[in-house]
């Protein structure tokens, strides 16, 4: 019963957001990985991306101006690892924070040899356990065949579902 209610709520939120197939195509059409997804699989990825945005907010870091196209692109990339698992695998967190470029977290950082520095190194992405995913828009745009900061950080979120990260996120059989 709860799943039916959640599905109903997601559909209402997606409809209220008003994203269209054409907007989605314009936002992600130049991403090479998307060419792997055709027909029904592509439609499921699009619909899952819309539902992702119904459940998660995308917030600006350092007053960065965010567009709907940016949100659609991030959501689509985020949904690739869970296309066969389902959106519930991203439960327990609610926000993607988007900076224009790489960012420096405001916290101490310890190197492998034990030296503690006042601040962390520059990052392109970060995932917090039961917290937000933080991304650099410049790094999102650099996503290609060999790297993708969104998929990388979302894999960490999946990995963290099992009482902390162990380096083995759940993957569906086709991955």
Residue map of PLM features:
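Active-site recognition of the HExxH zinc-binding catalytic motif
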Residues: 38, 145-161
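Auxiliary, metal-adjacent structural segments of Zn-dependent hydrolase domains
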Residues: 54-144
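Charged, compositionally biased N-terminal leader segments and the immediate start
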Residues: 1-22
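Amphipathic alpha-helical packing elements
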Residues: 16-53
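Post-HExxH zinc-binding segment in Zn-dependent metallohydrolases
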Residues: 160-175
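Active-site metal-coordination segments of metallo-dependent hydrolases
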Residues: 144-145, 175
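A generic secondary-structure signal for well-formed alpha-helical elements
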Residues: 53-56, 158-162
């Amino acid at each position: 019963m709860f799943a039916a209610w959640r599905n109903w709520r997601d559909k209402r939120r997606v409809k209220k957001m008003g994203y269209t197939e054409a907007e989605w195509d314009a936002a992600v059409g130049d991403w090479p990985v998307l060419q792997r997804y055709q027909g029904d699989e592509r439609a499921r990825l699009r619909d899952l991306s819309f539902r992702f945005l119904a459940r998660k907010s995308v917030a600006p870091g350092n007053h960065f101006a965010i567009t709907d196209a940016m949100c659609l692109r991030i959501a689509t990339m985020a949904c690739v690892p869970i296309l066969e698992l389902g959106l519930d695998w991203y439960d327990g967190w609610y926000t993607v924070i988007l900076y224009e470029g790489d960012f420096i977290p405001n916290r101490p950082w310890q190197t492998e040899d034990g030296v503690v520095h006042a601040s962390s190194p520059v990052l392109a992405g970060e995932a917090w356990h039961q917290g937000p995913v933080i991304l650099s828009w410049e790094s999102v745009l650099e996503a290609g065949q060999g790297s993708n900061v969104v998929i990388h950080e979302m894999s960490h979120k999946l990995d963290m579902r099992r009482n902390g990260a162990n380096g083995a996120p759940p993957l569906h059989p086709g991955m």
